[in-house]
Regions:
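Glycine/tyrosine- and acidic-biased, solvent-exposed loop/turn segments at the edges of beta-strands
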Residues: 1-81
Length: 81
């Protein structure tokens, strides 16, 4: 079993609007955005979703309208190997 002290430091973050709805949510790995991230409108609807690989946008990012329908997709490079 790996020594826990050798594992990368991770942290999750959730930022909220004044009305307490979530504004953005995601995780950090060693201080860099990493993994799934999402941004929301003040009404709580999803605005944009995508992934980071150690601070770099990767994969398909999606922009959603207020009903949740995908209105735009943007592709970014794949994660570093």
């Amino acid at each position: 079993m790996a020594d826990p002290s050798e594992q990368p430091a991770t942290a999750e973050e959730t930022v909220r609007y004044a009305n307490s709805n979530v504004k953005m949510r995601g995780a950090y790995l060693e201080g860099e955005m990493h993994g799934d991230w999402a941004w929301y409108r003040t009404d709580g609807s999803v605005m944009r979703t995508g992934q980071f690989d150690r601070g770099r946008q990767v994969g398909t990012w999606r922009t959603h309208d207020r009903s949740g329908r995908v209105v735009k997709e943007t592709g970014f490079g794949e994660p570093a190997k």
